[in-house]
């Protein structure tokens, strides 16, 4: 995050230089209409994760998996990120990976919506479609095949990566208590 001083000495604070800097710190909204409608004494809150840059809670997971891989040395300059997905994690990974300068290949079943495909491509990812009749198992197999063929590649592994749930333990949960 930078501060910019404009002509006349006006200071613009909170200027971000990359989309991944905007992940997290999403607002909480009290759902008063539901509380009233159900005559509840308890309070109900919603964490508005659509405020994340790529529009979902999966942005947190994407950022955590990429940053953990960078710290461990699995991911470095010139690496290619590969991920099998059916949607939001792939969108989040495409957003964060592109912002950090990585090439990313998203593998998804051909049965996924055209809108998801367009969004993934709009974030700068290469999209590889797998056989829709094989579901996510087919997408995982295709991603593993690509990883064997592409040097310096890294599968983020949302389904098995402990950074996925850890992201919420370290960010989402504490944010709820801080708000």
Protein language model annotation of sequence segments:
Residues 4-179:
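PLP-dependent amino-acid enzyme catalytic core
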């Amino acid at each position: 995050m930078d501060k910019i001083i404009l002509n006349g000495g006006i200071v613009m604070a909170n200027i971000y230089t990359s989309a991944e800097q905007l992940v997290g710190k999403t607002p909480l909204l009290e759902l008063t209409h539901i509380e009233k409608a159900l005559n509840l004494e308890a309070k109900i809150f919603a964490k508005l994760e659509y405020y994340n840059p790529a529009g979902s809670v999966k942005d947190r997971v994407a950022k955590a998996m990429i940053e953990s891989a960078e710290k461990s040395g699995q991911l470095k300059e010139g690496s290619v990120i590969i991920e099998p997905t059916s949607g939001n994690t792939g969108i989040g990974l495409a957003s964060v990976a592109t912002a950090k300068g990585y090439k990313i290949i998203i593998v998804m079943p051909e049965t996924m919506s055209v809108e998801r495909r367009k969004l993934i491509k709009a974030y700068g990812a290469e999209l590889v479609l797998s056989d829709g009749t094989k579901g996510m198992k087919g997408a995982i197999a295709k991603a593993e095949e690509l990883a064997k063929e592409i040097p310096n590649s890294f599968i983020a592994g949302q389904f098995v990566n402990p950074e996925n749930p850890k992201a919420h333990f370290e960010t989402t949960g504490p944010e709820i208590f801080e708000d």
